[in-house]
Every structure is written in structure tokens, then in C-alpha cells.
């Protein structure tokens, strides 16, 4: 069993409580020579979403912290659903105010904010985007005086892509174009891109 599998198995044990890197080094008896590789392994596992780091710099598997990994299925009105990776796990409704810059089909980690109550579906909030699904977006270029934007053809991508004048690369109003996303959206900002 490799170090990743050993760490995952350990963190999934019922008695496991989130630990920081020094505690894990002590438990696994990691030598100074092995430390760099061990730390890098934790970072890779975190990027993959198999473990998460709490705000106190402790590591745990997402499920033990009430977190769920999956893909976002967006609706043109701005809300979405998390389609969980874990078999048997039910979908989670994500209100538009809790989508936090995630776009359709992005792989994310969601924190449950409300469980099933009185027939209402459980709800969650995107707390981390693990992998972006839409790096190039097809849409209609719309020009304005100081900038332009691309309105995606896929209505599930419900945010226009801002295009600066220098990045329009000869596109004219009404052209069907491909925009490559250069800055991802967040709560307060639309995605930015360049016309290819």
C-alpha cells in the first residue's frame, strides 16, 4: 500500500481526528529525509480533493467534515446542483448566492448548509473549486464602447465573459467566437477572457 492509500485509510478511521502536518509526521514516523516528499504528497492529495485542510491547518477527508465532492450542474437562472462522486450520495441544491464562482461541470467541494427538512432538498455552498471544466467557451461577441463580452451559447454558463478591447483580436459585434478564460469568476467578478 502506497503512502496516499495509507494516509486515506488512516484518515477514514472512526477514531481519526484532524491532525496538522507535525502530528502526522509523528504518527507515521517520517524522517527528516522523507519530510519533503511527505509534505508534497499531502499537497497533491489536497489538490486532488481526496483530503482537505481546515482553517487550523489540520488535514482530514472531506466526508468526515460534512463536505461532499462532485460536479456542479448549473441552471441558466444561476443556481445549481452538486452531483456527488460518491455512490449513493444524494444531489445537493446550491443557491446562486452560494455557487461562489463555480461554473457548469466544475469539480468542487461543497459544505452542507441545510439537511433535508420537511421535504425541502438539502442545500450547500461551494467552498473549493478543484478542477475547472470550461476553459474555452463558445458564444456571441457583443461589443460596447470600452470593452466587450461573450454571451455563452450554453445557457448553463450563466455569466458573460468580459473581454478587454486589447483581447478581442478582431472580433466584431455578433460574431460567434471562442473565448479562453484567463480569470475565473468569484462572488463579485465575472470571468475574464481573450478571443482566440
Give the label of every model feature segment.
Residues 1-196:
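Charge-lined substrate channels and their catalytic hotspots, especially those that engage the 3′ end
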Amino acid at each position: 500500500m502506497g503512502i496516499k492509500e495509507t494516509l486515506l485509510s488512516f484518515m477514514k478511521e472512526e477514531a481519526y481526528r484532524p491532525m496538522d502536518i507535525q502530528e502526522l509526521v509523528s504518527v507515521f514516523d517520517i524522517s527528516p529525509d522523507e519530510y519533503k516528499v511527505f509534505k508534497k504528497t499531502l499537497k497533491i492529495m489536497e489538490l486532488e480533493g481526496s483530503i482537505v485542510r481546515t482553517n487550523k491547518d489540520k488535514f482530514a477527508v472531506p466526508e468526515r467534515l460534512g463536505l461532499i465532492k462532485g460536479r456542479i450542474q448549473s441552471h441558466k437562472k444561476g443556481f445549481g446542483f452538486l452531483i456527488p462522486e460518491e455512490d449513493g450520495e444524494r444531489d445537493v441544491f446550491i443557491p446562486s448566492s452560494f455557487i461562489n464562482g463555480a461554473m457548469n461541470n466544475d469539480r468542487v467541494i461543497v459544505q452542507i448548509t441545510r439537511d433535508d427538512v420537511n421535504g425541502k432538498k438539502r442545500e450547500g455552498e461551494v467552498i473549493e473549486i478543484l478542477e475547472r471544466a470550461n476553459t474555452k467557451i463558445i458564444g456571441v461577441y457583443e461589443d460596447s464602447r470600452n470593452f466587450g463580452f461573450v454571451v455563452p451559447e450554453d445557457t448553463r454558463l450563466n455569466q458573460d465573459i468580459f473581454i478587454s478591447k486589447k483581447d478581442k483580436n478582431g472580433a466584431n459585434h455578433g460574431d460567434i467566437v471562442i473565448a479562453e478564460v484567463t480569470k475565473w469568476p468569484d462572488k463579485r467578478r465575472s470571468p475574464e477572457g481573450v478571443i482566440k
